[in-house]
């Protein structure tokens, strides 16, 4: 007889048999894979001892490809087929991609999504990212000589549902079981929280190759709560490379036209940037088709050329603190994440803003992968005690459209996830059997000023009087930040739902703009909402009155009918204007003018109900 093994939920059946779970930092410039071995999180090296894998894929033809260092080495001579910084393309449309002209490979638009033209054909960012993830998966399986149980993959804090879903799709294509997606700052907090047993409020300043994130986290007794986020998904070390390349070309007067020359200048710019981390000056040198670009570059020149980029990061930090209602002095420390934070001007700018030196006791290139590995180890059931609770937040409010084009927020901005929130709605017209739902994202009061996420329809609502149906709309945001919306008519049980997967995401600049607009137009939005609500109430009153007149108008005398008709005409005229108070006044006037009619209808209804019935039967 076969025996069933019973174990604690979430724990491996055999306490001596550990599941192999890894953390993956899928970065714009570099990617890493880490795992917990002998109780310590560490990054896994390749066969040459290198833990970093450049996030680069070169397509030679339909069958052959190079990934990582080999691809990067061939970038200068085959720039058109060497794809770097693909993370910037994840879940985006062509119009959203910044610095397209500086990219050495060709982007195309397919069905609203950006793709890349290569020697192997048209490739999506998901397919290209899958090549990188698969390489890291093979590295981990070779290290442990076994199959992986799963992986925790990190994403920027501001990745929205579409970008997160694209990351999960890439992982699935690479043969990985995704245990969870967590934000990069949260992963860094895990690594620092465990190593230092620190509690309090911290800022995680994460400047990677292609994205910048600032997160304000509260660490309390194993609970990691993100209380504010900000950043820029189109700002990173790559932009410092571009800025330096532009500066050198402007100083030397050189022109670059070919993709190979552009790639060569960028490679030289990156090398100079890295050298200036420790040196005060460096000789910039790039071999071009028409000769060579040579320039003696001082660190002060590099700092000045890239100061606007550094200032953008500090502006985002300042805004995140405002959102969290904190001052720089309220923080216990600042954690630096990402290889780009090695630049002296970054550390200096952060120290000047906060008035203290940032924490740098963990390798900024590795800290995100290490935190993801710790979380993966726990989700695999390898660490039963001391589990961490991770509380990320959603960046913009979620809601649905109501009558008049107004937004009813259901999940507020900065709500911690995972979460599920519900609200009841009803029908607008008598006999209504379907309800169209429009899911939106944003902070403004009018749908026209927010971002549309999805539309779906609840059908099969039993016909009943307007306002009688009870429809519960539930928003569920899972631990990966993915949204699903359901609507259920409580009486009949009919239900409809939608999983929200936007065709492409918002950049952090767009999110910041939406938030700023919501602040600057708050008074205007409030007035606009009041006007729309007044018009909706007026329309509802007119519909109800007309329905009553159609059904029981014979109860009225000529004078009574004339008074109501005149009052309805005044309300219709008022509703055409922009004076909310006047519309509200006309609505109340119609309500007063129909009070006697309502009483007559009620008496007539009671009389009909009692007609023909004997007293003893009541």
From Swiss-Prot:
Select a single GO molecular function from the record's annotations and give it.
unfolded protein binding
Which UniProt keywords are present, listed alphabetically? ATP-binding, Chaperone, Nucleotide-binding
Q: Name one GO biological process term.
A: iron-sulfur cluster assembly
Q: Does the keyword ATP-binding apply?
A: yes
Q: Does the keyword ATP-binding apply?
A: yes
Record-linked Pfam families: HSP70 (PF00012)
Primary role: Chaperone involved in the maturation of iron-sulfur cluster-containing proteins. Has a low intrinsic ATPase activity which is markedly stimulated by HscB.
Family statement = Belongs to the heat shock protein 70 family.
Q: Tell me which NCBIfam families the record gives.
A: HscA, PRK05183.1
User: What name does the UniProt record give this protein?
Assistant: Chaperone protein HscA homolog
Give the organism the record lists: Variovorax paradoxus (strain S110)
